[in-house]
Amino acid sequence: MPLSLRLAPSPTALSPTTGGFSPAKKQCRIPSYSGVATTTRRIGLCSLDYVKRGDSSVVRCSLQTVNVSVGQVTEVDKDTFWPIVKAAGEKIVVLDMYTQWCGPCKVIAPKYKALSEKYEDVVFLKLDCNPENRPLAKELGIRVVPTFKILKDNQVVKEVTGAKYDDLVAAIETARSASSSG
């Protein structure tokens, strides 16, 4: 018989874990139930670790909620990028890969925000290419910042390097027209 657990945060049930878990992750103690084994399950952005300890079981749960709003630019990281891209389905996704210290990145940021308000059928994301996100930046093949990647169906279909606003608009228009005709 499958075990179904409903975890509700309460001050007595949750305490921060130590040793490598982010602040969003909590440790919850629940009574021991038969059928609970040491296992990890990943469901979307939620990761559950079941560990049997004595007469109780420990469930470590990480649940991150990422809201992608129309007309907004959503900040992503190495953990949230691909789930959001997959959730976008057939929508066009535009990713701004930037750094905090990049002058051209700062100049184009307000224009990028304006594009997110103009193209409400497109998902606009931004990724800070800091050391923590370096694996994703490397996976996406970044060489310079800013770099804009345009994705459709989980695949990069266009790339614009540098703060070239007109080139970015043209790439978005091309991807949108290819999307509507194909």
UniProtKB/Swiss-Prot annotation:
Site (Contributes to redox potential value): G103, P104
Primary localization class, coarse: plastid
Residues marked Deprotonates C-terminal active site Cys (site): D96
A GO-annotated cellular component: chloroplast
Keywords: Chloroplast, Disulfide bond, Electron transport, Plastid, Redox-active center, Transit peptide, Transport
Family from the record: Belongs to the thioredoxin family. Plant F-type subfamily.
Name the record gives this protein: Thioredoxin F-type, chloroplastic
Protein's job: Participates in various redox reactions through the reversible oxidation of the active center dithiol to a disulfide. The F form is known to activate a number of enzymes of the photosynthetic carbon cycle.
